[in-house]
Curated annotation (Swiss-Prot):
Keyword field: Decarboxylase, Lyase, Pyridoxal phosphate
Record's protein name: 2-[(L-alanin-3-ylcarbamoyl)methyl]-2-hydroxybutanedioate decarboxylase
Species this protein is from: Staphylococcus aureus (strain NCTC 8325 / PS 47)
Keyword 4Fe-4S: no
Cofactor (UniProt): pyridoxal 5'-phosphate
Modified residues (N6-(pyridoxal phosphate)lysine): K50
UniProt keyword annotation of Cell wall biogenesis/degradation present: no
PANTHER family, per database record: DIAMINOPIMELATE DECARBOXYLASE (PTHR43727), GROUP IV DECARBOXYLASE (PTHR43727:SF2)
GO molecular function: carboxy-lyase activity; diaminopimelate decarboxylase activity
Reaction it catalyzes: 2-[(L-alanin-3-ylcarbamoyl)methyl]-2-hydroxybutanedioate + H(+) = 2-[(2-aminoethylcarbamoyl)methyl]-2-hydroxybutanedioate + CO2
Subunit structure and binding partners: Homodimer.
Family of this protein: Belongs to the Orn/Lys/Arg decarboxylase class-II family.
Length: 400
């Protein structure tokens, strides 16, 4: 948190309205160095661009990861600005013919096929273009899976090929000369916080992939193990134990004889969540029908994650004594307070009824762990408020 304090003080000293995203690119580099250097030799890290696709974020990340995982033509184009096409993998449901043609024409590394119909459409495009394409089949396993915030499989969802249909899709893919089936893509859980349980999930992936490869007699070259590594917003001191996971993961690879299979992770939240801060100031404090509210500059149209996940987002308060007005600030202490934005909706809530020691108008609120699924998923122009400004902290300077 100390890294953002000088920036906040500078903004306040200049009487600059405080409503910013601040990204710690130095911390991002250190994090990426650690996680990528600890992976086994047959494992590669891809960045799931959907978590945050700001150009300076992508530029920094591109120097450490094998490539980008993308889910649209627009994301392919963003990725191509920093990586060649053979370092881009294309997944996600509902790919259009236009997107598939674009991916094929650009030469993306692999396409993760989500259904028999998508496979047939891709094959028709390849025949029309007289090209070949490496693919993985995304499988929606039946489960059961460990506890996690989000489940992408094991229950009805729009993702992947139902496990009971996989055999038919494999046979179809193997019969298509333009299709090179390299293996499987699994992404069954999201925001898992237990590193030991994550190893168990990977073990299940290995078992399923090997069984299908042996049954259908094709070489298993590649498994995408998804992302799914979580962030604990409720307790920032108790996060996913990456080092423990990697050590057990390495052992599992040897035990399951997977050393000759290329393994991928496609992480997003785990890579960028902790390096972002949404910083805003208190405009008003008032009591309505017995409940205290602090109204902040901006709102969830800029930082939607707390509404999307229905949680109280972690924050710190920077107190400021200066008062630009001739009348007193509004101040409260030791009150349960709800932090809201400027939107004309009661759903515009960052944190609800949280105990606050002291808060005044003019104070600055710093929402931590705002680097993933913040600005990128928000409805920016609701009520036409100004957009936040963006500051990127590097070794030598602040970039805006």
């Amino acid at each position: 948190m100390r890294i953002v304090q000088p920036v906040i003080e500078q903004l306040k000293a200049q009487s600059h309205p405080v409503c910013h995203y601040i990204y710690d690119l130095v911390g991002l580099e250190h994090h990426l160095q650690h996680i990528t250097s600890s992976l086994p030799s047959n494992c590669q890290m891809y960045y799931a661009m959907k978590a945050n696709s700001e150009r300076k974020i992508l530029d920094t990340i591109s120097q450490y990861v094998e490539g980008f995982e993308v889910a649209s033509q627009g994301e392919i184009a963003k990725g191509l600005a920093f990586k060649p096409a053979n370092h881009i993998i294309f997944g996600g449901p509902g790919k259009t013919d236009e997107e598939l043609r674009y991916a094929v024409s650009e030469g993306v590394q692999r396409i993760h096929v989500e259904s028999m119909h998508e496979l047939q459409r891709l094959n028709a495009i390849l025949e029309d273009e007289d090209k070949t394409q490496h693919i993985l089949l995304r499988v929606n396993l039946a489960g059961p899976f460990p506890n996690a915030t989000l489940h992408m499989a094991g229950r009805p969802t729009q993702f992947g090929i139902s496990e009971d249909e996989v055999d038919d899709v494999i046979e179809a893919a193997l019969a298509m000369p333009k299709i090179h089936l390299d293996g499987f893509h699994f992404h069954s859980i999201s925001n898992n916080l237990d590193s030991n349980l994550h190893v168990d999930v990977v073990k299940l992936y290995f078992k399923k992939a090997k069984a299908w490869s042996e049954k259908h007699r094709f070489p298993l070259k590649h498994i995408n193990l998804g992302g799914g590594i979580g962030v604990n917003y409720a307790d920032l001191t108790n996060q996913f134990e990456w080092d423990n996971f990697v050590e057990r993961f390495k052992t599992l690879i040897v035990e399951q004889e997977m050393e000759d299979v290329t393994l991928n992770f496609e992480c997003g939240r785990f890579i960028v969540a902790h390096i972002g801060y949404y910083v805003t100031e208190v405009l008003d404090i008032k009591k309505v029908h017995g409940a205290w509210y602090a109204i902040l500059r901006g709102g969830t149209q800029q930082f939607r994650l707390p509404v999307s996940w229905q949680h109280n987002h972690p924050f710190d308060i920077y107190r400021y004594k200066d008062n630009p007005y001739s009348f007193e600030k509004v101040s409260i202490s030791r009150q349960d307070t709800t932090l809201v934005g400027q939107l004309c909706t009661p759903k515009d809530v960052f944190a609800r009824e949280v105990q606050i020691d002291a808060i005044s108008t003019g104070d600055v609120i710093v929402f931590k762990y705002a680097g993933a699924y913040g600005w990128s998923i928000s409805h920016h122009d609701f009520l036409s408020h100004p957009h936040p400004e963006f500051i990127y902290l590097t070794q030598t300077k602040e970039d805006e």
